[in-house]
Amino acid sequence: MKKIAIDAMGGDNAPQAIIEGVNRALASFKDIEIQLYGDQEKIKHYLESEERVTIIHTDEKIDSDDEPAKAIRRKKNASMVLAAKAVKEGQADAVLSAGNTGALLAAGLFVVGRIKGVDRPGLMSTLPTTNQKGFDMLDLGANAENTASHLHQYAILGSFYAKNVRGIAKPRVGLLNNGTEETKGDPLRKETYALLSQDPNIHFIGNVEARDLMSGVADVVVADGFTGNAVLKSIEGTALSIMKQLKSSIKGGGFKAKLGALLLKESLSDMKHSLDYSGAGGAVLFGLKAPVVKSHGSSDANSIYYTIKQVRTMLETNVVGQLSEAFSKETISND
């Protein structure tokens, strides 16, 4: 039985969206147990059944405007902190939260802990592509500054995840740069390019540009945390803007526009699906001793369900255990 610790009070729509997502996951997956950390009365209001559910009551939670490191130290009984401690103490196998991103990163690093040999765990998410296959990108903001060695390690981590969780036999790894030529980029990108080119364990395809990411140019895209976070926000904003503009044009275009939308309903639905990243789950702080997964702060029940599904797959494939073993045996170089 896979035990997942969930911060029931984290996120804009907590606890309702969290618990409704849990209800659906419990109905779909009979091999999971859920530990819910938060206000017991509020949790029970939305919970359909307590079968395979344990509620750990706490009145304390970490707010979105709390300073991450201080919040982890001072709010020791916060729902997020208790969920992370459950993983550290072996009471749960993974932790999930839609709360304060910085605080979850801090809890992951300082409570759950890094895999030995991993210098900087990276925040990774599966983002949408027009071919609906998606691509994994890291770092998405766990670290503002990185070295070439860190980016090399992100390529290793991303490849490992793509193989073991997403089932891609030979993941194509691209380095995000301002051009595809080998000579492009600043010293960080050039040094990283050299490291990735020399690693036989990585299927490195070279530099990739931001404009090509959503066309599926690579299965894994490596970037420093600052750049990765900027690209993530750009992709999210672009997808939202496209859908908003389409709705506005249809509503304001009169009868012909509405008729056209009706005729193109299936195609528009496919396009919306291709731009929707919620079905891929949350962002993984990859490189820790257990799965620590961040769902979007505005997640609805559907997003929470898919994030639980993602965590279940990570546990089912034992991707963290395999990664830890690989690093401990030094079969993967992180020099």
Curated annotation (Swiss-Prot):
<comment type="subunit">
    <text>Homodimer. Probably interacts with PlsY.</text>
</comment>
<comment type="pathway">
    <text>Lipid metabolism; phospholipid metabolism.</text>
</comment>
<keyword id="KW-0963">Cytoplasm</keyword>
<keyword id="KW-0444">Lipid biosynthesis</keyword>
<protein>
    <recommendedName>
        <fullName>Phosphate acyltransferase</fullName>
        <ecNumber>2.3.1.274</ecNumber>
    </recommendedName>
</protein>
<keyword id="KW-1208">Phospholipid metabolism</keyword>
<dbReference type="GO" id="GO:0005737">
    <property type="term" value="C:cytoplasm"/>
</dbReference>
<comment type="similarity">
    <text>Belongs to the PlsX family.</text>
</comment>
<keyword id="KW-0594">Phospholipid biosynthesis</keyword>
<keyword id="KW-0808">Transferase</keyword>
<dbReference type="Pfam" id="PF02504">
    <property type="entry name" value="FA_synthesis"/>
</dbReference>
<dbReference type="GO" id="GO:0006633">
    <property type="term" value="P:fatty acid biosynthetic process"/>
</dbReference>
<dbReference type="InterPro" id="IPR003664">
    <property type="entry name" value="FA_synthesis"/>
</dbReference>
<dbReference type="InterPro" id="IPR012281">
    <property type="entry name" value="Phospholipid_synth_PlsX-like"/>
</dbReference>
<comment type="function">
    <text>Catalyzes the reversible formation of acyl-phosphate (acyl-PO(4)) from acyl-[acyl-carrier-protein] (acyl-ACP). This enzyme utilizes acyl-ACP as fatty acyl donor, but not acyl-CoA.</text>
</comment>
<dbReference type="GO" id="GO:0043811">
    <property type="term" value="F:phosphate:acyl-[acyl carrier protein] acyltransferase activity"/>
</dbReference>
<keyword id="KW-0443">Lipid metabolism</keyword>
<dbReference type="GO" id="GO:0008654">
    <property type="term" value="P:phospholipid biosynthetic process"/>
</dbReference>
